[in-house]
Amino acid sequence: MRKTLSILAISLPLLVSGYAQASESGVLKAKLAEISTLKANFTQTVTDVNKKEIQKGSGVFALAYPNQFYWHLTEPDESLIVADGRDVWIYNPFAEEVSVMDLNQAINASPIALLVHRDEETWSKYTVTNEEGCFSIAPKSVDAGVESVDVCFDGNTLTQMVLQDQQGNVSQFMLSDQTAISDDELSMFKFTVPDDVDIDDQRLNTVN
């Protein structure tokens, strides 16, 4: 009897924890399901492991379900990330280089891509916790390059994202001027490779 109680004492918290994580994952996915499209301005602040500010920036962020997002950093140095529903294009104008990978590779590189991805098998690779309107998404794999991504809401409005990498650097993105995307703006999710740039094609798989 005492042994049985000991097993229960160990097992019940694990069961409750597993249920809570599943529930919080469901709450986050429900909130994301309310956002079929979104466009916003962002400001970015990057701090190192000692909490020293090492970079500030700004730009435009947009997403559309399914599997489309747009990330245009305009300051201090321009860079562009476009997910067109299947492939993810990363353009560095200064280096005159474009890298392209499939969406599943991008999700493995950063859970931020989960914002527009609803595949249950992919979501099962992450734990989700919720504290005061901020959901923390952490990969279960120890090989992931990102430690966690926090996604914060004010009601159902996405307001902030915080990304922490394995080196302890933290990137905070504050969103403002959030609007839905008009039909005329959907072309932002289509990337055209500029002339005279090098292309690094890393695509491996199809999208789940």
Curated annotation (Swiss-Prot):
InterPro entries, alphabetized: LolA/LolB/LppX, OM_lipoprot_carrier_LolA-like, OM_lipoprot_carrier_LolA_Pbac
Example GO BP: lipoprotein transport
Complex and partners: Monomer.
Residues of the signal peptide: 1-22
Function: Participates in the translocation of lipoproteins from the inner membrane to the outer membrane. Only forms a complex with a lipoprotein if the residue after the N-terminal Cys is not an aspartate (The Asp acts as a targeting signal to indicate that the lipoprotein should stay in the inner membrane).
Record's protein name: Outer-membrane lipoprotein carrier protein
Pfam family, one: LolA
Protein transport recorded as keyword: yes
